[in-house]
A protein has these predicted regions:
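ABC-type nucleotide-binding domain
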Residues: 1-205
Length: 205
């Protein structure tokens, strides 16, 4: 968590090895990520970003992007888990509906992206939480899908609203490119530092 421009995206880029650290190291299961190939590292992550995309093709093509041999049964099961089946089955041709960039809403794109990740079930997740640009009902569906997806997985959440990370086991508070505080929600509130100010300013506004 942290204000705009604090380094949250840079942190994720380092985690995914889009570029490497200049000093220090990032360890996953005790191993320096620079000792692992970029392909192997990235394939162990599932990503759901708020500015997600759909490729030109069918709904099925978009969901099976990371698992091209998936059966319809597996796809439908993942879609139900990800709360996207409700809108998919209403599309003119269901899974065979051809999508373009503006065929579905931003929230529906995010639900599709969650379905894609749900189908592959990677060991780690990077989630950029839903924004206020989606309607409340879809936002609740996205949050439910996130909760389902995170069970039993190491998850990194880029949070814009602090209410969504109250149950996180560890919160990293960033400012000006540095981690300035860390702890769980209760610990950080008790410290009365930057997180405390950030949290209360969101609820006051």
């Amino acid at each position: 968590v942290g204000p705009t421009g604090c380094g949250k995206t840079t942190f994720i880029n380092l985690l995914m090895r889009f570029y490497d650290v200049d000093e220090g190291k990032i360890l996953v299961d005790g191993k320096d990520i620079r000792e692992v190939s970029r392909h192997a590292l990235r394939s162990s992550f599932g990503m759901v970003l708020q500015d997600t995309w759909v490729k030109s093709g069918t709904v099925r093509d978009n969901i099976c992007f990371g698992k091209p041999d998936a059966t319809d049964e597996e796809i439908i099961c993942a879609a139900k888990e990800a709360r996207s089946w409700e809108f998919i089955r209403r599309l003119p041709k269901g899974l065979d509906t051809v999508l373009h960039e503006d065929s579905i809403s931003q929230g529906q794109k995010q639900l599709l992206c969650i379905t894609r990740v749900m189908l592959c079930l990677p060991p780690m997740l990077i989630l950029d939480e839903a924004t206020s640009s989606i309607d409340t009902r879809t936002e609740l569906q996205v949050q439910e899908a996130f909760d389902k997806l995170m069970k039993g997985r190491t998850s990194f959440i880029v949070a814009h609203r602090l209410s969504t990370i109250r149950n996180a086991s560890l919160i990293l508070v960033m400012k000006d490119g540095k981690i300035i505080e860390q702890g769980n929600h209760e610990e950080l509130l008790k410290k009365g530092g930057f997180y405390h100010k950030l949290y209360h300013s969101q609820f006051e506004s």
